Amino acid sequence: MKTKRLVLLSGLSGIGKSRIVQLYAKALGAESNLNFISVSPSWTDDTDLLGFPDTLNNVYRPGDSGLVNTLIKASNDQDNIYIICFDEMNLARVEHYFSQFLSVLEMEDRKILKLYNSDLEHRFYNSEQYPSQIKIGQNILFVGTVNVDETTYHFSDKVLDRSNVIELEIKEFSELLEFGKQKNIEKLKTIREQIGEFPITATTFNSFSNNDREMALSKSDLELLWEIHKVLQKASKKFGIGTRVVKHIDQYLKNIPEGAPITKEDGIDLQIAQRVLTKLRGVEEVMRELVGNYDEQTKTVTGSLLIEKLDNSNYNFTRSKKMIEQKAKELSHNGFAI
């Protein structure tokens, strides 16, 4: 979230994706500024989300989602954090209804969302309430929850290039006994005391981010990413690792807090799984050399060029290899990987 990219939480229905967003907002003291938007399967373009200019009646009509009102409120309240969560984000095609946001979120500084032509502003009766442009400030965080089943759409590369996909796993049910115990509550209180303020302001939250120009990725890390890119490109020209993704991976690594349970090795592993492997899907002819052959008897994968490249590194890449293994298994069972 600190990297200001779109964060997508993926996992089984009922695993707690929406709850995590609620708890994150609670931890920041931003519960009242959390807007849950339920995505409709009928959405086809950004007017369903944002609204549209009614030139017949000379007014701007915002969408029923309440997104525009939240963005305007956040723009006029830069001191406080606002979180916008798109629930079941892939019930409709994200690149259709979210197209303008995908472009705006990629801008580093001047993030401007256009609602309508500025020439119409003097004509609209409610232009003071709904101006033609809204500035997306550093106090707004975007997150989406995702279910992967027959009722949803796959994300396009355009979406995946601009987001972090975090796949949630189910903990053993016996661990539920530990949740909510006093030690966890006390730990949260201690963190709040260390920060020294509550609710946490946007300025304080942004100060957590590390925006140093010096790269966290080492030369050997970059060489590994380049080798993976070449292998992907050889399989298909639509696969690969763009410069944008490399920069985002570097920014992610720079923002791992000191003393965190996640190490740099874990971070690179997570980022390859979240930013690179999520885009790999296709038929056997394209995918076989990349993910290898899955053996049902031994439950292992052989002949994977991607695993071969990862094995040449000093890192373990546990998550990435597990994801490649899953895709090899899908390929073996279905003739394609998703």
Give residue ranges: language-model regions.
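C-terminal regulatory/interaction module of P-loop NTP-utilizing enzymes
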Residues: 1-338
